[in-house]
Structures are given as C-alpha cells and as structure tokens.
C-alpha cells in the first residue's frame, strides 16, 4: 500500500463525470442552510456501477457524525439503505433526510438497473470545529475511485479513511460490532488522519480539488496533515498534466504519419 498518485487532472470540471459516464455530478447554488447542493445522474448500467450490480455488491456503508444529508429523486429509482433496511425512493416521495450517525448507502434500486437515476443531494453545514462532507470531499473520493477501479487496482484502506475523515464521513463497521459508530469514528481519526498523515496519505489532492485553497485551509488545521497544504501544488500539477497532454498529442501525430 502507498499514498495515491493522481493520474488525472479534473479540478474545475463541472459537471464532474466519472466511471465511463456511470455518474455525473453538477454543483448547484446552495440554499442558505446547506453546505452544498449537487445535481446527480447515476447510470447503473455503466462503468463501476455495472460491475457492482453484476457482483451483487454495494458502495461502502458510512455515516456522518455532524451533518444531516438529504436526497430527492427527480427521475428513476433510488434505494437508500438506512441502518441495513433498504428504502426505495422515487420522484413521488419528496426529500429524504438522513440524520447524523445513521449508517447508510445509496444505489440504483435493484430490478431497475437500466434506468438512469436523477437526484439532488445536499447536507447541512458542519458543526464548529468538525470536518465536513463538501465539494472537496466528493471531488477527491470520486477521483481516487476512478483512478483505482478503472485500472483494476486494489483500494487502499488508509487512503480511504484519510479522505473520509477529512470529509466528515466514516466507514461503518459490520452491524455486529459493539458501538460501531464510535469504532468507525476512532478508526477514521487514528488510522486515516493520524497514522495516514504520518505515512504520507493526504486527504485532498490538487489534481482533483477545484477550491484548493479551501482544502489547504482544512489540512492546516491538523498537525498530521499541514505539510500537504502546499498552495502552489495545483499550478505545478496543472503544468505537469498540460505537458503530458501535449506529449501525448505529439506522439499520436507521429504514429499516424
């Protein structure tokens, strides 16, 4: 295992489309009482979601200790597992609120895998001093997943815990683990933030983060992560990927001659 090295530069992309079009997320003007508002389109028949459907797997169950999360289906069928109980949602059901510390995960409703799911997702502002699920978290989590799964590599648990902790999100241990939320919280902080920070795992990467200054502000608040708050890193990364893109274009031109 080793800290990830981004292979793509997607900072500033809006909408952000990942996994061969399996999901597309656009930033919307947020209401005054919300941390963010995203318009998402999930296509369960494509990319990573098609692989999950084929194997019967789901995205990781998780919880947020300091934020309410909200889902509203605009088109299609969405399932939200709430503490292990699947709740099927359609456009007729209105907005669904998921309280803090609720173990949950969303996915296209089984039996409707070929349908596109259009939905809104938002969350309340974080509590003072707490990490938050926000745009920076989603950009890095999706960026990391795409780099890993599109190349058939194994996911690094420390990297996931580092990103989740910085995004106010924690993996849910199995249902039979006593005090599972507290266990998940401790694992995220100790392994993701503390140990991960010492081993070189940053929670945010300039290649994927649109508001890099905001990410640096967040990392500077942690002794274990402040060394990753390099405000000039994004410009260097942009120039690096521009050079690589130019070299790729030249190589293609020479090959076609």
Swiss-Prot record:
Superkingdom as given in the UniProt entry: Eukaryota
EC number: 1.-.-.-
UniProt keyword annotations, A-Z: Oxidoreductase
GO molecular function annotation: oxidoreductase activity
Keyword Oxidoreductase belongs to the record: yes
Pathway the protein contributes to: Secondary metabolite biosynthesis; terpenoid biosynthesis
InterPro entries listed in its UniProt record: RmlC-like_jellyroll (IPR014710), RmlC_Cupin_sf (IPR011051)
Biological process (GO), any one: terpenoid biosynthetic process
Protein family (similarity comment): Belongs to the oxidoreductase OpS7 family.
Name this polypeptide is given: Probable oxidoreductase yanE
UniProt organism field: Aspergillus niger (strain ATCC 1015 / CBS 113.46 / FGSC A1144 / LSHB Ac4 / NCTC 3858a / NRRL 328 / USDA 3528.7)
Lineage: Eukaryota, Fungi, Dikarya, Ascomycota, Pezizomycotina
């Amino acid at each position: 295992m080793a800290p990830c090295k981004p292979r793509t530069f997607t900072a500033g992309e809006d909408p952000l489309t990942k996994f061969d079009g399996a999901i597309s997320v656009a930033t919307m003007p947020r209401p005054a009482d919300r941390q963010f508002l995203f318009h998402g389109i999930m296509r369960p028949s494509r990319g990573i979601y098609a692989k999950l459907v084929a194997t019967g797997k789901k995205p990781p169950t998780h919880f947020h200790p300091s934020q309410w999360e909200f889902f509203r289906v605009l088109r299609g069928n969405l399932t939200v597992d709430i503490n292990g109980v699947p709740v099927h949602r359609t456009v007729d059901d209105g907005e669904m609120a998921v309280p803090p510390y609720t173990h949950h995960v969303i996915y296209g409703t089984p039996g409707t895998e070929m349908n596109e799911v259009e939905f809104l997702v938002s969350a309340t502002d974080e509590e003072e001093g707490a990490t938050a699920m926000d745009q920076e978290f989603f950009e890095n989590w999706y960026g990391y997943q795409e780099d890993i799964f599109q190349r058939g590599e194994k996911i690094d648990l420390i990297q996931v815990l580092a990103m989740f902790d910085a995004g106010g999100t924690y993996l849910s241990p199995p249902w039979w683990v006593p005090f599972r939320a507290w266990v998940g919280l401790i694992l995220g902080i100790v392994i993701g933030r503390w140990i991960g920070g010492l081993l070189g795992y940053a929670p945010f990467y300039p290649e994927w983060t649109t508001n890099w200054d905001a990410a640096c502000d967040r990392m500077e608040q942690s002794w274990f992560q402040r060394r990753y708050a390099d405000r000039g890193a994004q410009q260097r990364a942009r120039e690096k990927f521009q050079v690589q893109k130019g070299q790729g274009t030249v190589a293609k031109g020479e090959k076609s001659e």
